[in-house]
């Protein structure tokens, strides 16, 4: 049994921080110490912000995004193209695409990807909601922005099959050489995908 070096409140803070993705036990200890040292500037405001988020954050009933309103800010933005829908696995993917700031469209968050080995099937994802949105007739293109993994490919094929009876164009993100990437450092799968997705100049 390891020795306790701080009171239970600090230990609990460290344990909770260690559950945050990207923070292990050591990083959590460092973060906790930093927060405690900057109590008035960081710890107190962070605690307040977290409490407020816990009370106000909602899952958008339309697209699955997280926001403080339902429907979310993106779904209620009338400047966005209602005919184009980007399908993503998780909210983090939606936020990444928004940071790219290339398309002013709406989204649909699946809440994961199909993974039979992990027991995740179609009923565990928000695929039914996607089909219902497409069935409304307002959407003309569905862009599948799922990850280039085996599970992502499986999810994309399943969704394409589910939407095959609708008058909607289903596309997917091109995969290949990243901007600034050097060919020598890329794996064979990435190079093969880049060659298949080549474009005319």
UniProtKB/Swiss-Prot annotation:
Q: What is this protein called?
A: Recombination protein RecR
Family the entry assigns:
Belongs to the RecR family.
Q: What is the lineage of its organism?
A: Bacteria, Pseudomonadati, Pseudomonadota, Alphaproteobacteria, Hyphomicrobiales
Gene it is expressed from: recR
Q: Does the keyword tRNA-binding apply?
A: no
Q: Which UniProt keywords apply?
A: DNA damage, DNA recombination, DNA repair, Metal-binding, Zinc, Zinc-finger
Role according to the record: May play a role in DNA repair. It seems to be involved in an RecBC-independent recombinational process of DNA repair. It may act with RecF and RecO.
Any signal peptide, and if so, which residues? none
Tell me the Gene3D superfamilies matching this sequence: 3.40.1360.10, 6.10.250.240, RecR Domain 1
Q: A single GO BP annotation from the record? A: DNA recombination
Which HAMAP family does the entry link to? RecR (MF_00017)
């Amino acid at each position: 049994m390891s020795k306790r070096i701080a009171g239970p409140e600090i230990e609990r803070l460290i344990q909770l921080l260690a559950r945050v993705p990207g923070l292990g036990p050591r990083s959590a200890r460092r973060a906790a110490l930093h927060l405690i040292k900057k109590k008035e500037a960081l710890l107190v405001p962070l605690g307040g912000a977290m409490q407020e988020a816990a009370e106000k954050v909602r899952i958008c009933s339309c697209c699955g995004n997280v926001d403080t309103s339902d429907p979310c800010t993106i779904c209620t933005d009338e400047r966005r193209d209602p005919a184009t829908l980007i399908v993503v696995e998780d909210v983090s993917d939606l936020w990444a695409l928004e940071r790219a700031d290339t398309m002013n469209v709406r989204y649909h968050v699946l809440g994961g990807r199909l993974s039979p080995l992990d027991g995740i099937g179609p009923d565990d994802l928000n695929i039914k909601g996607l089909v219902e949105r497409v069935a409304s007739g307002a959407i003309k293109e569905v862009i599948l922005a799922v990850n280039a993994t085996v599970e992502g490919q499986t999810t994309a094929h399943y969704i394409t099959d589910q939407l095959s009876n609708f008058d909607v164009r289903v596309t997917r993100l091109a995969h290949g050489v990243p901007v600034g990437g050097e060919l020598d450092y890329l794996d064979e799968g990435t190079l093969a995908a880049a060659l298949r997705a080549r474009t005319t100049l």
